[in-house]
Design a protein with these regions (language model features):
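Terminal amphipathic alpha-helical/low-complexity segments used for targeting or macromolecular assembly
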Residues: 1-44, 96, 102-115, 127, ...
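Flexible, glycine/small-residue-enriched loop-and-beta-strand segment within the central core
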Residues: 49-67, 71-143, 168-169, 176-177
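Glycine-centered loop/turn positions within well-structured domains
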Residues: 84, 153, 161-163, 171
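A generic "structured core" feature
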Residues: 129, 148, 153-154
């Protein structure tokens, strides 16, 4: 049953994630659909085309909470295997992937869908900015308030409040003043 629900959820996202619903007025329809899909969905959010919130491998859907004034650019993929909180004024730039699970491999044989390890969830705190092409890996549970992640970064650990990181793996560059 979960697989059927996830398939329906993905089809709805594909339909309402097309460029047609980026037109003024029609993008409000997309926001109404998202209000039904998530635990909470704030006001004045902009979610661009080709954004996919998905639950892989038939896992149970987690709680997704999205604050106010959130901007998610096109072609962003968010794995919803664990709870996700996107706080107010968060910007997620295009081509970003947020992963919330990994596969455990023990021995020579394994089944991808049965060896899933989920994380404790991810919180993107207020006013953080995730640069284009960023990959956030499952062990990350927090991107701090006001943090900036440079474009093309691979985030492998938590980021402090107002910290600026970039690179592969993402390394400390400095702090916002």
């Amino acid at each position: 049953m979960e697989l059927v629900k996830e398939t329906i959820r993905r089809v709805i996202q594909i339909i309402f994630g097309t460029f047609i619903f980026d037109c003024p007025g029609l993008n409000k329809i997309r926001n109404v659909i998202y209000r039904f899909m998530f635990m909470s969905y704030g006001k004045k959010n902009i979610v661009s085309k080709k954004v996919m919130f998905y639950v892989p491998h038939g896992a149970k859907k987690a709680k997704i909470n999205i604050g106010d004034l959130v901007r998610i650019s096109e072609d962003v993929t968010i794995d919803c295997t664990s709870d996700i909180t996107i706080s107010d004024n968060v910007w997620i730039s295009e081509h970003t992937h947020i992963m919330n699970h990994e596969h455990i491999i023990c021995g020579k044989e394994w089944k991808k869908s049965k060896n899933i390890k989920t994380t404790s969830g991810l919180e993107l705190q207020e006013d953080c900015w995730i640069g284009a092409g960023t990959l956030i890996l499952p062990q990350v549970t927090q991107i701090g308030k006001g943090a900036i992640v440079g474009a093309g970064s691979v985030v492998t650990k938590n980021i402090d409040d107002y910290e600026i990181v970039a690179g592969n793996p993402a390394r400390h560059i400095g702090y916002r003043e």
